[in-house]
């Protein structure tokens, strides 16, 4: 993808959980930047999207947060994936892989 696109519907939780699983503790801005970096700039993830998702994931018990200092010594909330979050990540990854396989078969099918 050359142009920026919004993150595909239904993948935000998956990408946030995966980012925290790989990177460890990160603040919200760092999570968003890391997702954009891995997507090589092809996804746009605005802060109005990431913070409600982080709150929702924390309420579900899939992540935890604590206050700390960012790289520029500003106060920031840092997030970490929980054991329940790792289980959810595994389930969502499996579901996403099944969905991709089905859509791929449908797109490649010729009568």
Could you describe each region identified by the protein language model?
Residues 1-10, 92:
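Intrinsically disordered, low-complexity serine/threonine- and proline-rich regulatory segments
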Residues 86-111:
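Amphipathic alpha-helical dimerization/coiled-coil segments
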Residues 58-75, 80:
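Beta-hairpin "wing" of winged helix-turn-helix
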Residues 27-28, 78, 89:
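Amphipathic alpha-helical segments enriched in hydrophobic/aromatic and basic residues
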Residues 6-49:
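N-terminal helix-turn-helix DNA-binding core of bacterial DNA-binding proteins
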Residues 50-57:
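Basic amphipathic alpha-helical segments that dock to polyanions
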Residues 81-85:
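Accessory beta->alpha helical hairpin/"wing" motif in late/C-terminal subdomains of nucleic-acid enzymes
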